[in-house]
């Protein structure tokens, strides 16, 4: 009766088939858990480091995917509008302020009649803040890269010490003890392998992030120079000298 109900359920709702765990997964899960426990206590901090690395990778991936997908369109819209109307360009940048490039372009556009130097300083100050946000998570990844192999090595050393302490070296040692020693050494090396895998993954993520940050620095510099050039050529009007300065200059003449 129960089997008939299951068949009817899967026939009416095929999506349940994809939700059901596969037999391979069910058989491999206890084996993976056993291998994890064989590594000893050091495997738990390695597990924590792997979770931190994965979390950082997903968070940074979400940040960069949003920025890279939308920034080109935002830049084109702002620069095209800046040639005709700075107010419209400011509104477009304001609408995109959830992105780093939007905040970067908005900083000089919200100033009232700035000089070119002030215009550039506003972009540079905002760029420094945005680059600091882009580097978020780098220190954590660097720590994981350095710490994970050391933890793996520590687990291997403690495992080897535990293995050799259990051997009866003075008694000559039997074949069973030799087999047990070989098994213990193999289990001790699990932590080294785990530490290396965590460090390699963190290193790959870190290098990708550093590459993206370098590209964005060049991109921000190019976009900022283009916006500043538009402002200088189209909108900037040098202020006339104040009357009192003109008077002082005439008095100073011989």
Curated annotation (Swiss-Prot):
Topology in the lipid bilayer: Multi-pass membrane protein
GO biological process: protein import
Main location: membrane
Membrane-crossing residue ranges in chain numbering: 39-59, 141-161, 185-205
GO CC annotations, alphabetized: plasma membrane
Highest taxon listed in the record's lineage: Bacteria
Subcellular location field: Cell inner membrane
Key words, A-Z: Cell inner membrane, Cell membrane, Membrane, Protein transport, Transmembrane, Transmembrane helix, Transport
Function text: Involved in the TonB-dependent energy-dependent transport of various receptor-bound substrates. Protects ExbD from proteolytic degradation and functionally stabilizes TonB.
Family to which this protein belongs: Belongs to the ExbB/TolQ family.
The protein's name: Putative biopolymer transport protein ExbB-like 1
């Amino acid at each position: 009766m129960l089997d008939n109900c299951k068949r009817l359920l899967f026939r009416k709702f095929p999506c349940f088939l994809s939700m059901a765990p596969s037999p391979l997964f069910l058989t491999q899960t206890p084996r993976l858990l056993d291998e994890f426990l064989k590594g000893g206590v050091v495997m738990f901090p390695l597990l924590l480091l792997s979770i931190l690395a994965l979390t950082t990778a997903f968070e940074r991936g979400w940040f960069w995917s949003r920025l890279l997908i939308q920034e080109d369109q935002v830049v084109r819209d702002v620069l095209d509008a800046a040639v005709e109307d700075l107010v419209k360009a400011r509104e477009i940048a304001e609408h995109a302020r959830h992105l780093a490039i939007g905040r970067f372009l908005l900083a000089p556009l919200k100033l009232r009649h700035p000089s070119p130097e002030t215009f550039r300083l506003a972009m540079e100050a905002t760029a420094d803040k945005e680059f600091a946000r882009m580097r978020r998570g780098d220190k954590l990844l660097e720590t994981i890269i350095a710490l994970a192999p050391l933890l793996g090595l520590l687990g291997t050393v403690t495992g080897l010490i535990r293995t050799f302490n259990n051997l009866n070296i003075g008694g000559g040692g039997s074949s069973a003890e030799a087999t047990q020693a070989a098994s213990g050494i193999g289990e001790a090396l699990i932590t080294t392998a785990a530490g290396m895998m965590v460090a390699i993954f963190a290193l790959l993520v870190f290098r990708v992030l550093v590459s993206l940050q370098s590209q964005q620095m060049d991109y921000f510099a190019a976009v900022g120079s283009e916006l500043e050039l538009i402002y200088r050529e189209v909108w900037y009007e040098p202020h006339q000298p104040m009357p009192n300065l003109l008077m002082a200059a005439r008095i100073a003449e011989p």
